[in-house]
From Swiss-Prot:
<comment type="function">
    <text>Dual-specificity methyltransferase that catalyzes the formation of 5-methyluridine at position 54 (m5U54) in all tRNAs, and that of position 341 (m5U341) in tmRNA (transfer-mRNA).</text>
</comment>
<keyword id="KW-0819">tRNA processing</keyword>
<dbReference type="InterPro" id="IPR030391">
    <property type="entry name" value="MeTrfase_TrmA_CS"/>
</dbReference>
<comment type="similarity">
    <text>Belongs to the class I-like SAM-binding methyltransferase superfamily. RNA M5U methyltransferase family. TrmA subfamily.</text>
</comment>
<feature type="active site" description="Nucleophile">
    <location>
        <position position="324"/>
    </location>
</feature>
<dbReference type="InterPro" id="IPR030390">
    <property type="entry name" value="MeTrfase_TrmA_AS"/>
</dbReference>
<dbReference type="Pfam" id="PF05958">
    <property type="entry name" value="tRNA_U5-meth_tr"/>
</dbReference>
<dbReference type="GO" id="GO:0000049">
    <property type="term" value="F:tRNA binding"/>
</dbReference>
<dbReference type="GO" id="GO:0005829">
    <property type="term" value="C:cytosol"/>
</dbReference>
<keyword id="KW-0949">S-adenosyl-L-methionine</keyword>
<dbReference type="GO" id="GO:0030488">
    <property type="term" value="P:tRNA methylation"/>
</dbReference>
<dbReference type="GO" id="GO:0030697">
    <property type="term" value="F:tRNA (uracil(54)-C5)-methyltransferase activity, S-adenosyl methionine-dependent"/>
</dbReference>
<dbReference type="InterPro" id="IPR011869">
    <property type="entry name" value="TrmA_MeTrfase"/>
</dbReference>
<feature type="binding site">
    <location>
        <position position="239"/>
    </location>
    <ligand>
        <name>S-adenosyl-L-methionine</name>
    </ligand>
</feature>
<dbReference type="InterPro" id="IPR010280">
    <property type="entry name" value="U5_MeTrfase_fam"/>
</dbReference>
<feature type="binding site">
    <location>
        <position position="223"/>
    </location>
    <ligand>
        <name>S-adenosyl-L-methionine</name>
    </ligand>
</feature>
<feature type="binding site">
    <location>
        <position position="218"/>
    </location>
    <ligand>
        <name>S-adenosyl-L-methionine</name>
    </ligand>
</feature>
Length: 366
């Protein structure tokens, strides 16, 4: 695979290899055959970041080869959304011959939605001033004249200039209902939107008919907790990043959901609060004991669950675990399988043509 060529003819083979690999990894814990969810074979990534290389009068996107660290010029990127590909061409054309926008520009980040909105961030090794803003506004207006629904942001050390806004609103059809998700620049969002829809629908399917409330750790912008709210009496969710919490609160209102409560705290802190080890001012007005959480949802970082959180989740009858790293999932399962058994197993091909796998398991108490 090269940045400008996807081996789409190998899609089925690479997916089959992942299924075999996941089954092998999960063998100590389950003999289930994974439910497999395919990605689009191209244009599946909704965000991308590129370094910018200055070559005399020329200017272009590059990425670095992971093995050799050599530069690779990238003029098109079929893994990314069609909108990102349009913007890559338009941004280079708009910046190449503009000294103010070009000088000391070292990176461009793209974030797009299925609803065809985009935020493009230009990163600089220089101070950004009013002259930069004027030129950036002219570029933005020129892009919009090409029917590109784009917002531009300038970033430099301790500086962030938003010409309009630093977010876009995604609209996803999830099990017969449109979900609105505000996505903030420089915050985590699911990179493969088509795959995200399938993950949300799978999570809804495995939790249908649920009793009681749902607890979610690491909720981000509310991606899962808001979609799953229809299956539970109430949802209590934690997140540490301020922009994500703000986006989650917006998403609750935008989707007219009234049974989700977001708390800004780390999973480790929440564990302490639930166990009565510490009291937190930010929990004032929230009666944790009133929640009857029979299901806990976790979507941890690549490092998986820490030991304390492992112990905490074992107290719940059902654990729904989405993993972006099956190796750490299996490490966690060494502990979790002492009290729970795997009921459902899914493979989500979030990152086609790479060794990365995303998977989901539903665990129920033995």
């Amino acid at each position: 695979m090269t940045p400008e060529h996807l081996p789409t003819e190998q899609y089925e083979a690479q997916l089959a290899e992942k299924v075999v690999r996941l089954q092998s990894m999960m063998a100590p814990f389950s003999d289930l055959v994974p439910e497999v969810f395919r990605s689009p074979v191209s244009h599946y990534r909704m965000r991308a970041e590129f370094r910018i290389w200055h070559d005399g009068d020329d200017l272009y996107h590059i990425i670095f080869d992971q093995q050799t660290k050599s530069r690779i010029r990238v003029d098109s990127f079929p893994a990314a959304s069609e909108l990102i590909n349009q913007l890559m061409t338009a941004m280079i054309a708009g910046v190449r011959n503009n000294p103010v926008l070009r000088h000391k520009l070292f990176q461009i980040d793209y974030l797009t939605t299925l609803s065809n909105q985009a935020v493009v961030s230009l990163l600089y090794h220089k101070k950004l001033d009013d002259e930069w803003r004027q030129e950036a506004e002219a570029l933005r207006d020129a892009l919009r004249a090409q029917n590109l629904n784009v917002h531009l942001i300038g970033r430099a050390t301790k500086t962030k200039i938003e010409l309009d806004q630093d977010y876009i609103d995604e609209r996803l059809p999830v099990a017969g209902k449109e979900m609105i998700y505000r996505q903030v620049e420089n915050s985590f969002t699911q990179p493969n939107a088509a795959m995200n829809i399938q993950m949300l629908e799978w999570a809804l399917d495995v939790t249908k008919g649920s009793k009681g409330d749902l607890l979610e750790l690491y909720c981000g912008n509310g991606n899962f907790s808001l979609a799953l709210a229809r299956n539970f009496d109430r949802v209590l969710a934690t997140e540490i990043a301020k922009p994500s919490v703000a986006a989650a609160q917006y998403n609750i209102a935008a989707n007219h959901i009234d049974n989700v409560q977001i708390i800004r705290m780390a999973a480790e802190e929440f564990t302490q609060a639930m166990n009565g080890v510490r009291e937190f001012n930010r929990l004032q007005g929230i009666d944790l004991k009133s929640y009857q959480c029979e299901t806990i949802f976790v979507d941890p970082p690549r490092s998986g669950l820490d030991g304390e959180t492992e112990k905490m989740v074992q107290a719940y009858p059902r654990i729904l675990y989405i993993s972006c790293n099956p190796e750490t999932l299996c490490k966690n399962l060494e502990t979790l399988s002492q009290t729970h058994k795997v009921e459902r197993l899914a493979l989500f091909d979030q990152f086609p043509y790479t060794h990365h796998m995303e998977c989901g398991v539903l665990l129920t108490a033995k």
